[in-house]
Amino acid sequence: MNTKELIASELSSIIDSLDQEAILKLLETPKNSEMGDIAFPAFSLAKVERKAPQMIAAELAEKMNSQAFEKVVATGPYVNFFLDKSAISAQVLQAVTTEKEHYADQNIGKQENVVIDMSSPNIAKPFSIGHLRSTVIGDSLSHIFQKIGYQTVKVNHLGDWGKQFGMLIVAYKKWGDEEAVKAHPIDELLKLYVRINAEAENDPSLDEEAREWFRKLENGDEEALALWQWFRDESLVEFNRLYNELKVEFDSYNGEAFYNDKMDAVVDILSEKGLLLESEGAQVVNLEKYGIEHPALIKKSDGATLYITRDLAAALYRKNEYQFAKSIYVVGQEQSAHFKQLKAVLQEMGYDWSDDITHVPFGLVTKEGKKLSTRKGNVILLEPTVAEAVSRAKVQIEAKNPELENKDQVAHAVGIGAIKFYDLKTDRTNGYDFDLEAMVSFEGETGPYVQYAYARIQSILRKADFKPETAGNYSLNDTESWEIIKLIQDFPRIINRAADNFEPSIIAKFAISLAQSFNKYYAHTRILDESPERDSRLALSYATAVVLKEALRLLGVEAPEKM
């Protein structure tokens, strides 16, 4: 039970009109620590009690009598709780030094499955910064859900089917060079893709030719299939090299093509349930009763199935294969209407588990305020960006610690961590402007800043040769250490909030606050000096390091021991 839960429990025993859950939601953290650690506003009770909030607050403060609090006082309409710093710091430090990286582990998920649809780059196109968001958000959510007791299944739903393959085949047959493609597959295929899109704007016959080649591909034409397979294989080699560098793994690479033979079954179910309507030669599902104006287009007039038909097949396959408790789609917010339709059609089909599907949208990455586009060749490629971030990190590490032994390894962890952290600290639904210099800075709210705080603590612990005792009696009651204790105590709740909101930025912002609080503590406190508090200060440093490292791990970011 954390402090807020304890206060809510105590208050619920003397307030008849509010239950513990309602009280918990009303509790606030005062801006000024002189007003206590936690405050309960009495306004909501005024109407029921028919008394002024100030009077209610005074009565509640009078009735509170718990040894967990240093004091409880009424200040105007608020009941302010001052916590017993020594007792709580002892509990928190005991918990972290005993449980170590398992501190804040929970079993909310009871080992049920969470399927995470993430990354999903398009075959034969380079892996750009645009794909990074889905990849790192999905990977972080996987760590977060595992932390609270779920098993996760990470699915890379590759864009390995569609008219763009008709475009690529036409471009390759017209202008492609087999040796050049073998040497630099993605670069060459991107050039071909950009060129045919540019030329098709002036020559509509290229579009028709591409459609024809895609029809051949759908019908199993040998040449079309061989080229498609080659484009796919070459792309996957490149993608996997990047995933290895990012330290992101997947449980399934079943992409769009995997569902080619599973869509007719979906159309049959819709037909049997009488859900398909004819509209201008096409077959659709009406979704007006769900407040969705446009019907879901299942089959075009030429018999071709659509994106939503494929996603329906994927949803049915995943439910059958994984029996998921949650199915999460980490896909850009421009797809919001599509996922509303997907859930509504599944509901119409009678599948209650459609409620377990969640679209986790995210904002765009821009460069100097401009939208990025592969088609127009205006794109930030991930591989050279990672190399540049690692190079910049190495320059700063050499300046700070020229004697460091494994500079390359540390620069790699810092450079890649910087890119991931910058993305994840941004509220998911907001976009951000790509700025490598800001990302790799050791100052400000960045990954390197948090990593450096962790490495600094490790240096302190090495100097002290500190090993925490499981039965150690550690406690502190000064203001600076109290700020850190409150944050560490809050870590389990922070993880729950991040999971409930599918929002890794909650953990990134927590990591920044904890690093800042420790740096402030370090500036004011002589941790290594001989004093009665020395062991407790070292235990606090140790606990901070444990929680910082775990917060970074939940974001998919490494924590180097030395920097």
Swiss-Prot record:
Keyword terms of this UniProt record: Aminoacyl-tRNA synthetase, ATP-binding, Cytoplasm, Ligase, Nucleotide-binding, Protein biosynthesis
Subcellular location(s) of the protein: Cytoplasm
Family per similarity comment: Belongs to the class-I aminoacyl-tRNA synthetase family.
GO molecular function: arginine-tRNA ligase activity; ATP binding
Motif ('HIGH' region): 121-131
Top-level taxonomy: Bacteria, Bacillati, Bacillota, Bacilli, Lactobacillales
Gene (name only): argS
Entry's EC annotation: 6.1.1.19
The UniProt record lists the keyword Ligase: yes
Reaction catalysis annotation: tRNA(Arg) + L-arginine + ATP = L-arginyl-tRNA(Arg) + AMP + diphosphate
Any one Gene Ontology BP term: arginyl-tRNA aminoacylation
Protein name per UniProt: Arginine--tRNA ligase
Principal localisation: cytoplasm
